[in-house]
Amino acid sequence: MEQIRLLLLLTIRVLSGSAQFNGYNCDANLHSRFPAERDISVYCGVQAITMKINFCTVLFSGYSETDLALNGRHGDSHCRGFINNNTFPAVVIFIINLSTLEGCGNNLVVSTIPGVSAYGNATSVQIGNISGYIDTPDPPTIISYLPGLLYKFSCSYPLEYLVNNTQLASSSAAISVRENNGTFVSTLNLLLYNDSTYNQQLIIPSIGLPLKTKVFAAVQATNLDGRWNVLMDYCYTTPSGNPNDDIRYDLFLSCDKDPQTTVIENGRSQRGRFSFEVFRFVKHKNQKMSTVFLHCVTKLCRADDCPFLMPICSHRERRDAGRRTTWSSQSSSGSAVLSAGPIITRSDETPTNNSQLGSPSVPPFQLNAITSALISGMVILGVMSFSLLVCPLALLHRKGPTSLVLNGIRNPVFD
């Protein structure tokens, strides 16, 4: 009788839990609780901010998906989420497009981060922080027995990316150069192009560039006479728009150069040019797309003195270095950090494709079941044939020496 009562209680509990979750992909044993901080996931993507909220705990708290809205905009259907019941647990998804990030009252705060480049130049980057919340409406009564739900989120991006995330942003820098007869100011720009003609600027599709796509970069100067050239000291990449990011990958620095990077022109004219193949940062391994920002530390140098400011890499240049004359402090200007990006790259989802991108495209040799069986049969047949050939030879070899040592009676006829 006690067992029947226990079974009846368990059945009632399961039925009540199923009724409470209304057939959604929830577990009454796991999700019969109020929401916690772990019930929201925030993804700061390259084109949108995505929030996923555990819908099961929302149901347990007595609310539905229509009760959740961005920043208290419960009367605006565009500020609500939608349910995805194909996951466990079921979730409510909110998506904020970066192109319309302030549509539902999200807050954008701009701050400036100071920094110092490798050459000691002071740099600053403007960062845009997007923040907001998702909540339930206040009840019309004085008291309520339902808990109020509140989920907060925040994402940070380079400001130039938020201004127009559909196009590449490029920074410029003004360099002041002092001469004997005065001072002039030249403006430098870092631009990205599709091909080696440098006619059409780089256009990135919404799905991103495939890995190993070749991108052509150019540093150009304006308001510059023929006595001065552009010299790129070094160029590197970061996953964010901050040139001082702790994660960086050098494309070329002094005599060291990335194997996929080609310096086309540097220090020989009023434009520096190079190309490189796009990649993804490993820190973006859980994302379908990766962001790459390009930075170049650049200066102006006198056309006659630029070769002397280039790094000495070959043995001949080292031998001839002693013949070089000294130059004055007016031979070059101060350095400036130029940035461009983001370059959005997409990663193939299959590991095989990723590994093939970094190796020669030689199709791997694979054995199917039939081929393996044929090879195995040929090996067995060869072993048996070899055994049949070796055994008689071994017997003959064993009998031969024995017959040679046989002794008989001497025949007198041969005397």
From Swiss-Prot:
Domain of life: Eukaryota
TM stretches of this protein: 373-393
Region called Disordered, residue ranges: 323-359
Cytoplasmic side: 394-415
Gene3D superfamilies: Zona pellucida, ZP-C domain
Domain ZP: 43-320
Disulfide bonds: C44-C155, C79-C104, C235-C296, C255-C313
Site-annotated residues for Cleavage: R319, D320
Protein name: Zona pellucida-like domain-containing protein 1
Species assigned in the record: Macaca fascicularis
Gene: ZPLD1
